[in-house]
């Protein structure tokens, strides 16, 4: 998988964490930089680790999937992206108060990284190495989450839902690209 595609996947996956970080950052009045680093580390760490777990689990499935891999990758990415878009349109909770502590952030990091687990399965099915994508996803998510906390503390809830919609569109688009490449190239 090329670097541009990997970066787009990373950005798409980071949008949930970005939206949560904006929302949480909007509640902060003190220690903004501290919370930005904590949120970035937790969200980035889980977003990097989950694709590896998905990839390890998906490697066992890859031999059974064969030529259906691109279809599975498309379906997973389209479902994940569609879910992100639907939740953003409905306004389902991405709201959190960081003042409740790091435990809340840990739970949110796990919850927002479940999508990355499914992406890891897609990488395995496509027989794609996982190290570079996992590192890229983690670094991008760290940066987006830290920036989200700082933006949220400065601008409030203006961007939260829009970020999830953009992330969902990116993931659906990547899934469609994988499928079209399989069908026509």
UniProtKB/Swiss-Prot annotation:
Membrane topology: Multi-pass membrane protein
Cellular component, GO annotation: plasma membrane
Source superkingdom: Archaea
Compartments reported by the entry: Cell membrane
Keywords: Cell membrane, Ion transport, Manganese, Membrane, Transmembrane, Transmembrane helix, Transport
Predominant subcellular localization, coarse grouping: membrane
Function of the protein: Probably functions as a manganese efflux pump.
Protein's UniProt name: Putative manganese efflux pump MntP
Native organism: Methanoculleus marisnigri (strain ATCC 35101 / DSM 1498 / JR1)
């Amino acid at each position: 998988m090329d670097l541009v595609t990997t970066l787009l996947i990373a950005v798409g996956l980071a949008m949930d964490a970005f939206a949560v970080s904006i929302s949480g950052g909007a509640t902060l009045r003190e220690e903004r930089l501290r919370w930005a680093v904590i949120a970035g580390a937790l969200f980035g760490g889980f977003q990097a680790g989950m694709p590896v777990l998905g990839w390890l689990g998906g490697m066992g499935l890859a031999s059974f999937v064969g030529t259906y891999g691109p279809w599975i990758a498309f379906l997973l990415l389209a479902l994940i992206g569609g879910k992100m878009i639907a939740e953003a349109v409905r306004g389902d909770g991405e709201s959190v108060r960081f003042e409740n502590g790091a435990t809340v952030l840990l739970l949110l990091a796990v919850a927002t990284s479940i999508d990355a687990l499914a992406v890891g399965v897609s990488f395995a099915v496509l027989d794609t190495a996982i190290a570079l994508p996992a590192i890229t996803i983690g670094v991008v998510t760290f940066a987006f989450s830290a920036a989200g906390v700082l933006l949220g503390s400065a601008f409030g809830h203006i961007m939260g839902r829009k970020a999830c919609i953009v992330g969902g569109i990116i993931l659906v688009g990547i899934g469609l690209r994988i499928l079209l490449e399989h069908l026509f190239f």
